[in-house]
């Protein structure tokens, strides 16, 4: 793995990692390395003499691609855990909630069971923001149906949701519950079936635009604090 990538896995930004490397602060197997593209194993790397290990509980943000299951294992299909770096795979990560197989965007993977439980608890009403491409352009009165809530399905009645159109004509939805296929069912209810769907944020933690699909990184200290505050921890 590239040296700069290893450093970013511990919470440094790409720019911070490269500056640290060029300053000679990173070592591989005890030797200073100033090449950001140098290939190394994470367990060989230190920064200012400190091993690049992630202590305690760890939460990753993943940019989930389409076609991937939000599950811990599957015999036939790729899962979100397949994208966890090899040197972290033994830490016991699990997904926080679920995204449908065809949905892309933010998935949180954590070793902290209490954090995961609180974030998905209906009582906490953690906000999740989605961006949907839907068939035809919804009218304002149709968006108002979503904002008011009270849409009755066989298994639940929807809570009030944020619903706005972007300049590109995409539907931005903010939900505080995690019912089965909720976004798709709400959009179909107002006559605008979903063509594609992406999750942008959970509990105020936004998907890093620098992450390509299939990439993940640990949360920054600020993101971690924000998420724990939302979870009441």
Each model region followed by its residue ranges:
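Basic, flexible Lys/Arg- and Gly-enriched helix-loop patches that mediate nucleic-acid binding at interfaces
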Residues: 1-233
């Amino acid at each position: 793995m590239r040296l700069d990538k290893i450093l970013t896995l511990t919470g440094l930004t790409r720019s911070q990692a490269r500056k640290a490397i060029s300053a000679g602060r990173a070592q591989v197997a005890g030797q200073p390395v100033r090449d950001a593209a140098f290939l190394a194993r994470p367990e060989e790397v230190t920064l200012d003499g400190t091993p690049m290990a992630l202590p305690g509980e760890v939460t990753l943000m993943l940019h989930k691609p389409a076609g991937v299951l939000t599950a811990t294992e599957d015999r036939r299909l790729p899962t979100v855990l397949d994208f966890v770096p090899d040197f972290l795979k033994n830490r016991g990560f699990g997904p926080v909630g679920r995204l449908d197989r065809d949905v892309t965007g933010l998935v949180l993977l954590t070793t902290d069971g209490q954090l995961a439980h609180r974030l998905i608890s209906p009582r906490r009403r953690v906000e999740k923001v989605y961006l949907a491409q839907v068939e035809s352009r919804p009218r304002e009165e149709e968006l108002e149906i979503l904002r008011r809530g009270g849409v009755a399905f066989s298994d639940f009645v929807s809570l009030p949701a944020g619903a706005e159109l972007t300049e590109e004509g995409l539907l931005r939805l903010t939900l505080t519950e995690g019912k089965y296929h909720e976004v798709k069912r709400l959009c179909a209810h107002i006559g605008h079936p979903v063509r594609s769907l992406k999750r942008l944020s959970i509990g105020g933690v936004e998907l890093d635009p620098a992450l390509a699909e299939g990439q993940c990184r640990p949360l920054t200290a600020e993101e971690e604090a924000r998420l724990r505050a939302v979870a009441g921890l």
